[in-house]
């Protein structure tokens, strides 16, 4: 008798654990910088910008479909989480910019970087929902290719977020926080661009 083997995937909710651990590491580096600069520990307003960036990084990397991930996890479930986190992240980033509206206006890089990041990620999220979600894709006029290119504005959002934090004097001088932030951001963006050309 032939038996059909069903592949058992690991829990997709591991993603939330990875995001939590990554966020705690980055928050730790940030607070280290604040304490070294003589500032009190803990600032939830900054976290409303940093944690969404951590989410962007993790989900953008997983969207490249690394082999270690695809061999253990269900991609369909991953994209469901991807969409939900995309919506939540846009909302939190909008709240972050609202909290810092007056202060960010004093910095050209901080102001424009923040709003370019929000706009780019917002468009990337909407395009992903409209053109790349299986159920919605059937009723949209534009094709999958258009959706993919618009969704790549996510990379623009990551670069804009990096420019955003360089606009604030205190954070821009933090070591090792800022170098780590820069390396992760541009490392991932370059890797994604490399994969884009590799597939051609």
PLM-predicted stretches and their roles:
Residues 2-200:
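Membrane-embedded alpha-helical bundles that constitute the cytochrome b-like, heme-associated redox core
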């Amino acid at each position: 008798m032939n038996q059909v083997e069903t592949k058992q995937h690991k829990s997709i909710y591991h993603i939330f654990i990875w995001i939590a651990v990554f966020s705690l590491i980055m928050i730790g580096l940030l607070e280290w910088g604040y304490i070294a600069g003589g500032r009190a520990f803990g600032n939830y307003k900054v976290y409303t910008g940093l944690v969404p960036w951590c989410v962007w990084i993790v989900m953008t990397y997983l969207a490249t479909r690394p082999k270690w991930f695809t061999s253990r996890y269900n991609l369909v479930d991953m994209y469901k989480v991807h969409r939900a986190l995309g919506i939540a992240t846009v909302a939190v980033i909008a709240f972050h910019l609202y909290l810092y509206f007056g202060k960010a206006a004093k910095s050209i890089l901080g102001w424009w970087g923040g709003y370019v990041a929000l706009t780019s990620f917002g468009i990337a999220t909407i395009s992903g929902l409209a053109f790349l979600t299986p159920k919605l894709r059937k009723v949209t006029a534009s094709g999958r290719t258009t959706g993919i290119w618009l969704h790549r504005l996510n990379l623009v959002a990551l670069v804009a977020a990096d420019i955003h934090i360089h606009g604030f004097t205190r954070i821009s001088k933090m070591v090792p926080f800022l170098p780590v932030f820069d390396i992760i951001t541009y490392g991932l963006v370059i890797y994604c661009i490399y994969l884009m050309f590799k597939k051609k």
